[in-house]
């Protein structure tokens, strides 16, 4: 699995800026107001062939006993427990503060490796900036600049050196590898028990650490499956809800290692933002998805209609996924769930012939042309498959940058229906034919127009008249000579 790096530090030391640098995005809000990043934010990064996950935590206020800052501190401690490495960020301009010392004391108690990074070090003397932070006893400080990127590469390179090279992904397996994901207490443990059997689960519960993730191979109705069982989703005991509700690292890691994700929802609870967040991770990773709405047997008909309305409203972006209304405790609906897992896997791994893809594209264009963007109408010529898990269709043509999102959705639905792509995301990429004269500098230079003055034009005209007169005189002379002879 990808190593997870947690960014920890007091408010306004530049964690969100460093997060943006490491993930090459601007997903985390960046502002000078201390404490702006309220909850943990997650992103993907890669150095060479080594991918990683980054957690952008809220500002660490360990001395506060109540209020939102206290909740942010608890989330940070949870992030430290779940991460594989911790980057402790301090402010090189402000210098060492008492709060930095308190945070360092907490981090020294953690079994995770801690890397001390002195941020905002651009333009300064590195030795001078780092000197006072040796007092924290966290090793040699890295002087970096999250805003400008100075020293960031060496920091991440040193962190990733301690982790092995990534092995071939389990997602490339020749059979469904699925992970059961979802919020706490929605019935993931009960579903895992229903799938594997109580004794098998208890045996695996006895081994491993809180960071272990177990791959269990099994067969159902003669078909092979592998379930990714993340530690801590079964019998964790009572966990602080304020911390646990933001814990999605295990879900992210499980999704990365699987080729199908099974999202479990609780029919007895309202659809929460965290449900949509976890579903979004699976969608962003391009994984096939099956949704299991658990505890369906314990609610009234009126509540069932309400749940369906909430799903349509809050999980509208999962229109490609198959929803199953099950009871894991009574093992109802499990067979249909496995049928959808197999179908979603088949759709994610489908191989589509190029001629058929192009025919479907041309048929879609005949039914509905892409709308104009100003004076330009996009022209799509042909398409082919560009990848699997998820399926990718690459469309070639001209002016494809002008294709609207609504038309892309139209093409997506058309391809999905033509190839029966149920349960998997489908991505469409536009490959625009290059225009060699796109840049003004590359255009062939036109010869400048010659501006001829009026006097020059008159002289040329007079010269032509004189030449005509001379020609006429010569003609008359030659005619006279002929007659004289």
Swiss-Prot record:
Keywords: GTP-binding, Nucleotide-binding, Repeat, Ribosome biogenesis. Associates with the 50S ribosomal subunit. This is GTPase Der. Residues 435-485 are annotated as: Disordered. InterPro entries: AAA+_ATPase, G_ENGA, GTP-bd, GTPase_Der, KH_dom-like, KH_dom-like_a/b, P-loop_NTPase, Small_GTP-bd. PANTHER family: GTPASE DER. GO terms for biological process: ribosome biogenesis. NCBIfam families: GTPase_EngA, small_GTP. Residues 457-469 have a biased composition (Basic and acidic residues).
